């Protein structure tokens, strides 16, 4: 899951390292980039206290930005998990633009929320109605990522930026702990 991405290790079965006690000052991508002068960010479309993400990321080299950084007029759609991916990507763009303006290289781990049950997203963006299942959520996520990359293409930092797109967990990472 998230720890696999942050720690560059295979997903762990059972309880996520993100949720476990004594999980601070670990060797994470965020801490490595921070030690090299980068602003390392974890940007999440929901509330960072969910699943202990605020604590884990903030104690492991990341600055955490979540739904609380958005003003009410910046939220065009919200469901039980958080804001629409488009709203999250606009927030991420604003944070990245700040880093660029301050002449700081950046590393941003951005976590969207639309591709989770109940699979809801803003109407009219894609040809599959909201609330109808995973296929629509995946297509909306694809639409939002495409829009983000296209919008980023007009930014002065774009040509020096690597985009890596992965899921936050896979179906096979669950397991039992003895």
Which ranges hold each PLM region?
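Solvent-exposed soluble domains appended to multi-pass membrane proteins
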Residues: 1-178
């Amino acid at each position: 899951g998230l720890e696999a991405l942050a720690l560059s290790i295979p997903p762990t079965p059972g309880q996520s390292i993100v949720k476990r006690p004594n999980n601070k000052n670990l060797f994470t991508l965020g801490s490595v980039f921070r030690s090299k002068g980068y602003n390392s960010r974890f940007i999440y479309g929901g509330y960072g206290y969910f699943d202990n993400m605020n604590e884990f990321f903030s104690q492991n080299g990341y600055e955490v930005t979540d739904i609380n950084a958005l003003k009410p007029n910046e939220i065009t759609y919200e469901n039980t998990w958080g804001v629409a991916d488009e709203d999250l990507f606009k927030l991420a763009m604003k944070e990245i633009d700040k880093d660029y303006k301050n002449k700081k290289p950046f590393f941003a781990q951005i976590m969207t929320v639309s591709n989770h049950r109940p699979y809801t997203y803003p109407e009219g963006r894609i040809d599959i109605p909201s609330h109808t299942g995973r296929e629509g959520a995946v297509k909306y996520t694809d639409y939002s990522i495409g829009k983000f990359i296209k919008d980023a293409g007009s930014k002065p930092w774009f040509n020096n930026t690597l985009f890596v797109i992965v899921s936050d967990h896979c179906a096979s990472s669950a397991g039992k702990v003895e």
